[in-house]
A protein has these predicted regions:
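Alpha-helix initiation and capping sites
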Residues: 74-79, 91-92, 141
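N-terminal onset of structured domains
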Residues: 22-28, 32, 36-80
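Proline-anchored loop/turn motifs at beta-strand termini and strand-loop-strand connectors
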Residues: 86-95
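Flexible, active-site-adjacent loop/turn segments at secondary-structure boundaries
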Residues: 74, 89, 103-107
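Domain-scale recognition of soluble eukaryotic interaction modules
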Residues: 2-42, 95-190
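Hydrophobic residues in beta-strands and at strand termini
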Residues: 68-70, 87, 100
Length: 190
């Protein structure tokens, strides 16, 4: 395998070892190549989102941890939010799973049944489509930008909690106060 200066060294080393053992490019190495491309895309022009790969004790390249800062003039201002991205072994055939790791008071984040699950149609359809092979139609960078947009917009139509959605529609000020409180309690910057 040729050395690629643009490739994350850990991914390149992992791929090189696997390819030497197997002598061919299998689904896992296709996924690792795509992961490297995704990482490179996410590393460019993402001032508001910090991408950090948490490789874990076992050098788990399929689990990333992302940090997002709550934007100004939103109830999430001053918050530091962590998102877990778990890529399936058959990536990119199936998309990754995105979850908030710390609590956030938001209509489109589930804290009752599936802790931290994010409901965005584009992410959910990507995860289950099984059709994303080869050139990426939807990327991790786009998914992260979609998640970042959640700080500015609540998706009432896809809210997890009807009571919370009613509060948002009928008393946005009360909703925003609760979101600020959760940000202070569960996502403090310091």
């Amino acid at each position: 395998m040729m050395n690629n200066p643009m490739m994350n060294p850990m991914i390149q080393n992992y791929m090189g070892n696997n390819m030497r053992q197997m002598g061919q490019m299998d689904q896992k190495n296709i996924g690792l190549t795509r992961l490297n491309k995704e990482y490179q895309l996410c590393s460019k022009d993402m001032d508001l989102i910090q991408i950090g790969c948490n490789f874990g004790l076992e050098n788990d390249l399929y689990h990333w941890r992302v940090t997002m800062t709550g934007p100004k003039n939103t109830p999430y201002e001053g918050g530091l939010f962590f998102i877990s991205i778990i890529f399936p072994e058959d990536y990119p055939t199936h998309g990754p799973e995105f979850k908030f790791l710390n609590k956030i008071y938001h209509l489109n984040v589930d804290w009752k049944n599936d802790l931290g699950h994010i409901c965005i149609n584009s992410i959910n359809s990507w995860r289950t489509s099984g059709k994303v092979i080869g050139r990426p139609v939807y990327t991790v960078k786009q998914a992260l930008l979609d998640i970042f947009c959640l700080f500015f917009k609540q998706g009432v139509e896809s809210a997890y909690d009807k009571g919370m959605a009613d509060d948002y529609v009928n008393n946005t000020e009360k909703f925003n106060e609760e979101a600020k409180k959760w940000t202070k309690d569960f996502a403090p910057m310091n």
